[in-house]
């Protein structure tokens, strides 16, 4: 088995490569700039320079691979950016996988992606298109839709920084929408298990952590774990969206306009237990996720 990973230098991708190499799986990572993949090479992954928007480089990277883990996505951009990187990029990876005779194609989507939200949030629209391309490809596939992914860094680090240093924590809208955060290494383990699980063939799985909380409860839980007492201040989603548009291009910005829109859409929780039954993996509770990231 030889696994091509796209997006392996990213937040989740790095942990997936780490999990694969921990089992001594043969990993080839497609990277735009090899110097950014030094940490993957140190794990024993093979680095191949290329870009999902360049069909020739993807085809070369896929040659000799039996499985593909496709993770590339962007959170911000213009409609043409989402189409070029996510939709067309997925078409390119699928074409390369088919030419290489890949046995299974594993896609990272997002919880909340469906036929309704695709017209409300550009990110969901691009993820929906990626799913559609995958299902129609003729390849054996597995699609994962994770809820908010928490780890060291990423969104959780932003939330924790706000709680740690600000006496008043701002919450978008009512804060009553529910989420189901999942620890990053639990996400990675789902991808690893999907390589060898016959029951995962041609399935789409929603995955989340063991705890469902509202945004208000999330911030209170973070404060509890950090030993802080914090007041919550709710701001209208429209104001948050305007602020996000103005700052989303700044490195380290807390949220993009699309991420604010995702919160507005409503609850982001798993609606069935298919992944639990299929993979039977232990999942890290929310408070432990926060402790690990602290």
Which residue ranges define each predicted feature?
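Mid/C-terminal beta-alpha module of Rossmann-like enzyme folds, strongest
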Residues: 2, 193-255, 269-294
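NAD(P)H-binding glycine-rich loop region in Rossmannoid oxidoreductase-like domains
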Residues: 34-92, 96, 111-119
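SDR active-site strand-loop-helix element
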Residues: 6, 30, 71-72, 105-111, ...
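Conserved beta-loop-beta element that borders a ligand/cofactor-binding pocket
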Residues: 109, 131-153
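Alpha-helical membrane-targeting segments
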Residues: 158-184, 224, 229-267
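N-terminal Rossmann NAD(P)H-binding glycine-rich loop of SDR-like oxidoreductase domains
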Residues: 3-23
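Glycine-rich "substrate-gating" loop/helix at the edge of Rossmann-like oxidoreductase active sites
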Residues: 119, 147-153, 173-184, 208-211
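Substrate-positioning beta->alpha
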Residues: 154-156, 174-195, 202-203
């Amino acid at each position: 088995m030889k696994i091509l990973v796209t997006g392996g230098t990213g937040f989740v991708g790095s942990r997936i490569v780490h999990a694969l190499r921990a089992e001594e799986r043969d990993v080839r990572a497609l990277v735009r700039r090899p110097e950014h993949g030094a940490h993957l090479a140190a794990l024993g992954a093979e680095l191949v320079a290329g870009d999902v928007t360049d069909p020739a480089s993807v085809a070369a990277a896929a040659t000799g691979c039996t499985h593909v883990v496709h993770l590339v996505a962007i959170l911000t951009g213009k409609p043409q950016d989402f189409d070029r990187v996510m939709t067309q990029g997925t078409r390119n990876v699928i074409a390369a996988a088919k030419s290489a005779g890949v046995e299974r194609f594993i896609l990272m989507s997002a919880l909340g992606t469906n036929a309704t939200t695709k017209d409300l949030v550009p990110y969901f629209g691009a993820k929906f298109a990626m799913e559609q391309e995958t299902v129609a490809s003729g390849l054996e596939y597995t699609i994962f839709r994770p809820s908010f992914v928490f780890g060291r860094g990423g969104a959780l680090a932003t939330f924790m920084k706000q709680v740690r240093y600000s006496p008043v924590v701002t919450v978008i809208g009512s804060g009553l929408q529910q989420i189901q955060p999942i620890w990053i290494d639990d996400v990675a383990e789902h991808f690893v298990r999907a390589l060898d699980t016959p029951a995962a063939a041609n399935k789409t799985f929603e995955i989340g952590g063991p705890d469902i909380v509202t945004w208000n409860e999330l911030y209170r839980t973070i404060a509890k774990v950090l030993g802080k007492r914090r007041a919550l201040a709710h701001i209208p989603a429209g104001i948050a969206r305007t602020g996000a548009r103005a700052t989303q291009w700044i490195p380290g910005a807390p949220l993009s306009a699309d991420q604010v829109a995702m919160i507005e859409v409503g609850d982001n929780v798993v609606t069935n237990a298919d992944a639990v039954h299929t993979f039977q993996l232990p999942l890290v509770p929310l408070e432990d996720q926060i402790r690990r990231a602290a």
